[in-house]
């Protein structure tokens, strides 16, 4: 019998390593059987309410279905923020029989960090797949842009895949926020975290750069990058924000030079780069600096169809450019399996 899972019943069920493994399988399966995954679809009301739909599945986990979330989106001072976010709703069906398994209300939370924001867990687990294939295996240092919940989740994913990292430099616009972040998470994660006063200090001396903000503006100059570094960015954006008059131009966090200098660019889905005209990659494509076909997909790396990092001097760039139903359902299915084993949830008679 299917069950209903509420937010409090999703707490403490899934760890970051398990989530990264599941999301990796989601992208691998989506590459080998493309019709089981699809880009997100979004609609906007004139008042700024956005509804995002994420259809997809992970056949290896026995799940297919969709996720939906609604939020009141605002743009101010170069940042996107959410005046209100409703709990997401995921519908899980058996990918072999079509039978309903569960209706899941709320965010799946990570064991270590607890409640997430902006789908931070799935986003970080997706970055984690990129870290697995693109970050130098002997990486020792990282630069982190952002000091909120998304940044904490991204850092945990990085440390999960590269436990060799012992030093992190964090930059955000608010000095007090970055100081508090460094104090809290250096203790929690057991690494040195140093708040820095300028973006360049989080870029030049490190092996890995992770952008975990909600900005609409470029965070650093791509000319600051040096050989061997990896960059992850998480701002996707969608053309409807411009078409609806919410933004004058596409959202960006990374500049043209970053894309131009990268030896390997990876996106979650190439289709979303063009269909949503996502600024960080679409603008340099339009300007003739890079080509869409040179961008690898995350699932191609996971399936072994394209290589990840192959040399110590490569600059690699993962554009975690949008969520997918397959990734959402991978993490949600893990939570469902654990919850069911623990006797959580309310049976639904249908």
Predicted regions located by residue number:
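N-terminal ligand-binding/catalytic initiation module
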Residues: 1-120, 128, 138, 292, ...
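Rossmann-fold NAD(P)-binding glycine/threonine-rich loop
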Residues: 225, 230-307
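Short acidic low-complexity segments
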Residues: 191-206
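NAD(P)-binding Rossmann-fold cofactor-contacting core
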Residues: 161-186
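Glycine-rich adenosine-cofactor-binding loop
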Residues: 127, 131-159, 172-177
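Structural alpha-helical scaffold elements that stabilize or flank donor/cofactor-binding regions
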Residues: 201-205, 224, 258
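C-terminal helix-to-coil terminal segments
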Residues: 310-350
